[in-house]
Amino acid sequence: MTVLGIITTTLDVAVILIVFANTTTLAGFSRDEVLFLYGAAGVSFALCDLLVSNIDRVSQHIKAGTFDTFLIRPVSSWLQLTTDRFNPNRLGRVLQAVLVLGYAVAVLDLEGRRLWMIPVMVVTGFVIFAALWTLVGAAQFLLTDAPELGNAFTYGGQQLTQYPLAVYARDLVKGVTYVLPMAFVNWQPGLYVLGRDDPFGTPEFMRFLGPAAALALVLAAGLAWRQGIRHYRSTGS
C-alpha cells in the first residue's frame, strides 16, 4: 500500500510536469521552483496526515457513543484521537514528498545561508496543518457533519499550497496570509529560500513570520478544542 500511495500522489507531480511541458514558467516561477514549493508543503501535509488527521473522526465517536472513553483516561483526548487507528499506509505520501523536495533542493542553485529555513518551514507547515485539523475536530462537537466541510480547509489547503500563490487572485492571497495563514506553510518562507521577491509586494520581514502565525493558529485551535470538550454532552447524559 505504501507503493500505491506513492503512485497516487505522484499524479500531482505529473500534473506539474505536464504544465511545464507547455511553458517554461508558471506565474514567473520555474519548474524546479514549483517542485520545491510543492515538496515543502507536501512533506508538512503528509506528516500531518500521518500523525494528526485522525482528529477529524470526533463526530464518528460522538455518534457511536465511544468518545467518552477518551475522556475518562488520564491522557489528553486530543493525543488519544490523533493516535487512534494509526495508518502506516500514509507513509507513501511522506516518502514521495521528501523525494520531490530533495530533488528540488539538489537541482536549484540555492544560497547556503538560506537553507536553514527549509526545516523551519516544514515544521511550521506541519503545525499549521495540525492546528487546522484540530479546528475541524473541534467544530464537530457542534456540527456532526463537519468532516466534509473541514476537508475544504485541510485537503483544500494542501491543494492550494501545491502551486505558487502568485497564480491566485490577490484577494484570495490576502485571505490566506492575514486570516487563515496558509501562505506561511511554504510561500512566504519559500520566497526567502529561493531569493525571490513577493509578486504581491509584501515586506521582507513577512518571510520570517511563519512560526508566529503557526503559534497564533495553535492558540486558536487549542481554545476551540477546550471549548468543544467543555460543551460536549455524553450520549448517556
Predicted regions and their residues:
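Hydrophobic transmembrane alpha-helices and immediately adjacent juxtamembrane helices
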Residues: 1-237
